[in-house]
């Protein structure tokens, strides 16, 4: 896992150079949004169960996926879906705090699509639930933090798509 600071410094170090204006500007932006990201993370942590519940209600609960024969029909499958959504929310929050999506690649997306395909998990429905989670989260954290947080939900969706 990297963060915005490490990414900028490593890029300069690999080239054996000092930070250029663009690198300094990236760091400045990261630090200027620090309080916003921390407040958003606290709001998400305090409302995680509600975010998941509303996301499921918006995207999955009344679809064919939860009816008999659907991929979320049994209690065990439903619980696994809720667990996965919580996992995506938590790691998207970590990525937002770090200002870098590498944790999503390392801990969420690496092999996930293949695993879901082998288990018959419908990726389209998963993406729909993540997009609903993005919408619910943005409504809680506000437009500025929501824009930042949305990047990480979109990253997960892109990795699954």
From Swiss-Prot:
The keyword Heme does not apply. NCBIfam families: apcB. The keyword Amino-acid biosynthesis does not apply. The modification N4-methylasparagine is found at residue 71. (2R,3E)-phycocyanobilin binds at residue 81. It comes from the Eukaryota. The lineage of its organism: Eukaryota, Rhodophyta, Bangiophyceae, Bangiales, Bangiaceae. Its main location: plastid. Light-harvesting photosynthetic bile pigment-protein from the phycobiliprotein complex. Allophycocyanin has a maximum absorption at approximately 650 nanometers. GO terms for cellular component: chloroplast thylakoid membrane; phycobilisome. Heterodimer of an alpha and a beta chain. SUPFAM superfamilies: Globin-like (SSF46458). It is a peripheral membrane protein. This is Allophycocyanin beta chain. GO terms for biological process: photosynthesis. Contains one covalently linked phycocyanobilin chromophore. Keywords: Antenna complex, Bile pigment, Chloroplast, Chromophore, Electron transport, Membrane, Methylation, Photosynthesis, Phycobilisome, Plastid, Thylakoid, Transport. InterPro entries: Allophycocyanin_b, Globin-like_sf, Phycobilisome_asu/bsu, Phycobilisome_asu/bsu_sf. It is found in: Plastid, Chloroplast thylakoid membrane. Belongs to the phycobiliprotein family.
């Amino acid at each position: 896992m990297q963060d915005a600071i490490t990414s900028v410094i490593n890029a300069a170090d690999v080239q054996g150079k000092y930070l250029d204006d663009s690198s300094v500007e990236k760091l400045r932006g990261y630090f200027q949004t620090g309080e916003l990201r921390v407040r958003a993370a606290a709001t998400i942590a305090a409302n995680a169960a509600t975010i998941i519940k509303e996301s499921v209600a918006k995207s999955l609960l009344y679809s064919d996926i939860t009816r008999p024969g659907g991929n979320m029909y049994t209690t065990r499958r439903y619980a696994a879906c809720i667990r996965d959504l919580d996992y995506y929310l938590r790691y998207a929050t970590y990525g937002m705090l770090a200002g870098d999506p590498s944790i999503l690649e390392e801990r969420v997306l690496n092999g996930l699509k293949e695993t879901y395909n082998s288990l018959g998990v419908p990726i389209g429905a998963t993406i729909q639930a993540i997009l609903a989670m993005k919408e619910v989260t943005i409504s809680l954290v506000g437009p500025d933090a929501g824009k930042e947080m949305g990047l990480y939900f979109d990253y997960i969706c892109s990795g699954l798509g």
